A protein has these predicted regions:
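Chitinase-like catalytic core of GlcNAc-active glycosidases
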Residues: 30-251, 256-273, 290-296, 306-320
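Secretory targeting and sorting signals
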Residues: 1-29
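N-terminal onset of structured domains
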Residues: 274-275, 283
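Short glycine-rich, acidic/polar surface loops and turns
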Residues: 283-289
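Residues that scaffold, gate, or flank divalent-cation-dependent active/transport sites
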Residues: 303
């Protein structure tokens, strides 16, 4: 502010100056950081969670990952996908045509639908140029056939960062590329998954690390943190942010309910606090990050079906911010 130096005006300006001085305390209040992107997995199988048609997914989910495409037993590196017959029966005859129409419905709502590859029991191996090409060709075919917007990599039994990066760069029609590593996979830039994330940084949408089924891990400050706490989220995400990923490429993956994972569930309010902490420095736990990263990527849950069984508590809490 520039102060008027004419003494005769000082009295007249005193009230205005008082208001002007008071105003910054309101204007500079730290914003609450809602999730930039909320990703959820839609289960193409039944396991006790609420069975859902794809069109049942609420609009609070920006990215819907269809779980899962599996290894093609006849072609190394390639993947296949089909609607699960058990799910179809549970939904009273949900057909492939219904599923395809539902993808169009989600698109009309502004939601992205991607095909997730692998999962806990996935046995897909991309370890050379041939398998990389086979992977890219098969995923491109699924994108073209179903109208998927991209692909999610959820390989939990090892990954080759060189050839998977080659494969992902070869995919045609993918506007969304996400990764879902386990916490151990993102402890250091020397790990395969972290290398992959950096190798595809030019096309990467977000890395939704699974902050569950983990046990204790090191944070960016070298201290050990236990899953199920806000500090576990912020201290480990800090490692990724310091390791070269853009803030928008770092997401927090959690179980949607206590039934969604063996360990690591925590109140979705903690996820919102963690996003705030990383983006603004507010609502931190014991760990305070060395800096803030505006535009943090958001959150992910396993799964939309488990969230539905829990009254969509995760989506309603995290998306509302």
């Amino acid at each position: 502010m520039t102060h008027n130096r004419i003494p005769a005006l000082l009295g007249a300006l005193s009230a205005t100056l008082a208001l002007a001085v008071a105003a910054p305390s309101v204007a500079t209040a730290q914003p609450h950081a809602a999730a930039q992107t909320l990703t959820g997995y839609w289960q193409d199988f039944t396991n006790g969670a609420t069975a859902l048609r794809l069109s049942d997914v609420p609009t609070s989910y920006n990215i819907v990952a269809v779980a899962f495409a599996n290894a093609d037993p006849n072609t190394p590196g390639a993947v296949t996908f089909s609607l699960d017959s058990g799910l179809s029966s549970a939904l009273g005859g949900y057909s492939d045509s219904d599923f395809r129409n539902d993808i169009s419905t989600l698109h009309s709502r502004g939601q992205k639908v991607i095909i997730s590859v692998g999962g806990q029991n996935g046995a897909i191996s991309v370890s050379d140029s041939t398998s990389a090409t086979n992977f890219a060709t098969s995923v491109s075919s699924l994108i073209s056939s179903y109208g998927f917007d991209g692909v999610d990599i959820d390989l939990e039994n090892g990954i080759n960062p060189q050839y998977m990066a080659q494969a992902l760069h070869q995919i045609s029609g993918a506007s969304v590329v996400t990764l879902a590593p386990q916490t151990i996979d993102m402890q250091s830039t020397s790990s395969g998954y972290f290398q992959l994330a950096l190798n595809i940084k030019d096309i990467l949408t977000v890395v939704n690390t699974q902050y569950y089924n983990s046990g204790t891990m090191n944070g960016c400050d070298g201290n050990v943190y236990a899953e199920g706490t806000e500090d576990f989220l912020t201290a480990l995400a800090c490692t990724q942010l310091q390791g070269g990923l853009n803030p928008s490429q770092v997401g927090l993956g959690l179980p949607a309910s206590s039934s969604g994972a063996g360990s690591g569930y925590q109140d979705p309010a903690n996820v919102t606090k963690a996003l705030d902490c990383l983006a603004t420095g507010n609502n931190c736990g014991s760990f305070t990050p060395p800096q803030t990263w505006g535009g943090i990527g958001g959150a992910m849950d396993w799964s939309i079906n488990w969230d539905a069984a829990n009254g969509y508590n995760f989506a309603n809490t995290v998306k509302a911010g």
